Regions:
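Conserved "HGTGT" condensation-loop signature of ketosynthase/thiolase-family condensing enzymes
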Residues: 1-94
């Protein structure tokens, strides 16, 4: 059985950009989002490189108090989902 899927919006939270246009331009330009890890001391790990988000600020999408309680990867997921809703011009009402 096949099911149809409709993609109505996209949101991105990536080391190459947190806005779709910026992300896409960096992809097209062949830029790498990989660099030396700076968010923590990685000297005890076999590799000290990774794809970190620089200057990530979830404040536009998540209350600061709530963000402090959430793991960073959860913040990334929430922000990406909210950006996808915006991109799709979808509004969620209670």
């Amino acid at each position: 059985m096949s099911k149809r899927v409709v993609i109505t919006g996209a949101g991105v939270v990536h080391s190459l950009g947190t806005e779709l246009d910026e992300f896409w331009e960096n992809i097209k330009a062949g830029k790498s989002g990989i660099s030396k890890i700076e968010n923590f001391d990685a000297s005890d790990f076999p590799s000290q490189i990774g794809a970190e988000l620089k200057d990530f600020d979830p404040g536009e999408y998540i209350d600061r108090k709530e963000a402090k309680r959430l793991a960073l990867y959860s913040q990334y997921a929430i922000v990406a989902a909210m950006k996808a809703l915006e991109n799709a011009d979808l509004e969620i009402n209670d």
